[in-house]
Amino acid sequence: MILIIYAHPYPQHSHANKRMLEQARTLDGVEIRSLYQLYPDFNIDVAAEQQALARARLIIWQHPMQWYSVPPLLKLWMDKVLAHGWAYGHGGTALRDKDLMWAVTTGGGESHFAIGAYPGFDVLSQPLQATALYCGLNWLPPFAMHCTFVCDDETLQAQARHYKQRLLAWQEANHG
């Protein structure tokens, strides 16, 4: 099962993430947990989130990039749900050998994230990758959709279909 942990503070204004989720929903075996819809008060049901993670074989952290990081509710979710003794540390093996993919949308172009004036994706992904590895997760190559503020609908749809193809390829390679 693919579990998408979706964190968009303003989903009603989303163009790219909305299309990505629409494409993901067309696949069997995909569960989407929209954190800002589930927890508008930021009071996370840790047990429910851990149960969802336990069912998953591929976990996706999907969100718009905000200040080169994750939205605040996703960070809180990580702090609470990825608990010592459950996700890491003594007895913390619940996530071991599951796959994790970071699916992120950006307003900037792909060239903005090339090494140069701003940090590249290799640098920006390090905290997430370190978290994944610390929890025993297999870090998969990220999926990034760039220029989402200026892309036309056709481009957004094409990129969202590419996202679906990544998920489908994972399902085929991992038998669901």
Swiss-Prot record:
Keywords: Cell inner membrane, Cell membrane, Flavoprotein, FMN, Membrane, NAD, Oxidoreductase. Its EC number is 1.6.5.2. GO terms for cellular component: plasma membrane. It catalyses: a quinone + NADH + H(+) = a quinol + NAD(+); a quinone + NADPH + H(+) = a quinol + NADP(+). Its main location: membrane. Coiled coil: none annotated. GO terms for biological process: positive regulation of potassium ion transmembrane transport; potassium ion transport. One of its GO terms (molecular function) is FMN binding. It is found in: Cell inner membrane. SUPFAM superfamilies: Flavoproteins. This is Glutathione-regulated potassium-efflux system ancillary protein KefF. It comes from Citrobacter koseri (strain ATCC BAA-895 / CDC 4225-83 / SGSC4696).
